[in-house]
Structures are given as C-alpha cells and as structure tokens.
Regions:
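Basic, helix-initiating cap at the start of DNA-binding domains
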Residues: 1-22, 26-35, 52, 64
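Amphipathic alpha-helical packing segments from all-alpha helical-bundle domains
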Residues: 66, 85, 110-145, 170-173
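Amphipathic alpha-helical segments enriched in hydrophobic/aromatic and basic residues
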Residues: 19, 28-29, 40, 50, ...
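Amphipathic alpha-helical segments used for helix-helix packing
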Residues: 91-115, 156
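Hydrophobic alpha-helical connector segments
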Residues: 56, 70-96, 144-147, 169
Length: 183
C-alpha cells in the first residue's frame, strides 16, 4: 500500500504557498488542488473538509516552529539567553514563511481554529515559564501570556517590514528581564 504522505504533504505545501499571497478565508479546495496539481478527489482522501485541512496546515506550521524553538533552547539553562534564543527562533521562522500572517492573525477568527490558537499560545507561555522564573518572576503566568502576544505582534511588524526588528526584539527582552517587584 502506498503512503498517503506525499499527496498530503503536496496539498499542505500548496496551501502554504497560497497563503503567502492570499487570505485564509479565500483559500478554496479548488485553489489548493490546482496549486498542488492534483485532482479534487485527492484532497478528500486526506481531509473530510476544508476546515480539517486548515487545522492540519495550522498544526504543521506551528510544529515546525516548535522544532526550531526547542532546538535553539536545548543546551541553554533557563533564563535570559534561553528566552532570547526561543524568541529569535520563533521570529526568524515566522519571517522566513510567507504564510505566517494568515496562520497567525487570520487563524484567530477562522471557525475551527480558535481552539488550536489558544492551545498553542498556552503551550508557548508554558514553555517560557522556567525562563521567567529564573529571571525572578514568582508568578510568571500573566507575564508569559503577555510575552506570547507581544512576540506575535513583533512577528507581524517584521513581516510587514520584511526584515528583523532588532530594536523591538531587544525591547521585549528588556521588559521580560527587568527586576520584578513583588508580584
């Protein structure tokens, strides 16, 4: 039996390419299969609906980012340097992917994706809590949630400018690294 992965990946790649130039809401099954050079029936062999396809696209995008973030953090102890490495890995990954804007912003309002967005944000906040604790935050949860939102905003600024904004990146790290007062 032939593996479904090549066709599935070709369809996901096609959607990711389309999202580099089009809004999430405007990506149709017909556009996806045309971009992939596949028949419409092949789409439905992998996903029962467009909504499930968008979930798979969102999951793959974030899984790839998480891989690079975890690799950047792997050898570093919790604290400033690890937080900076994670943030830079995320932002550099977003900047390199033209579909980022659709998968970061538009997915927040797309039916069927809001639970994934919330879960990814929570996961990202949880990942940085040891760093915030090492920086002196005794109650890091609200700070982590705010940092997740701020990093996503920096990603959008950088996408619009088509380049890194090291000043924003350093500014956010300064906020996270400030000496906390009683929480």
């Amino acid at each position: 039996m032939r593996s479904p992965e090549p066709g599935r990946n070709a369809l996901l790649d096609a959607g990711q390419r389309l999202l580099g130039t089009a809004d999430l809401a405007r990506i149709s099954v017909n556009a996806i299969v045309a971009e992939a050079g596949m028949a419409k029936g092949s789409f439905y062999q992998h996903w029962p609906s467009r909504a499930e396809y968008l979930r798979a696209l969102h999951i793959r995008f974030h899984d790839e980012l998480v891989e690079s973030i975890e690799a950047a953090m792997a050898e570093l102890p919790p604290g400033h340097d690890r937080l900076e490495a994670a943030m830079n890995a995320y932002l550099d990954g977003c900047l390199a992917e033209p579909a980022t804007k659709a998968l970061l912003v538009q997915s927040r309002t797309e039916a069927g994706l809001t639970d994934l967005v919330a879960a990814r944000n929570h996961s990202a906040a949880t990942l940085m809590m040891p760093d915030l604790q090492a920086l002196g935050w005794s109650s890091p949860e609200p700070i982590a949630a705010l940092l997740v939102a701020a990093v996503a905003e920096i990603a959008l600024v950088e996408l619009d400018a088509r380049q890194r904004d090291d000043e924003l990146r350093r500014g956010l790290l300064r906020l996270a690294s400030r000496t906390p007062t009683a929480d």
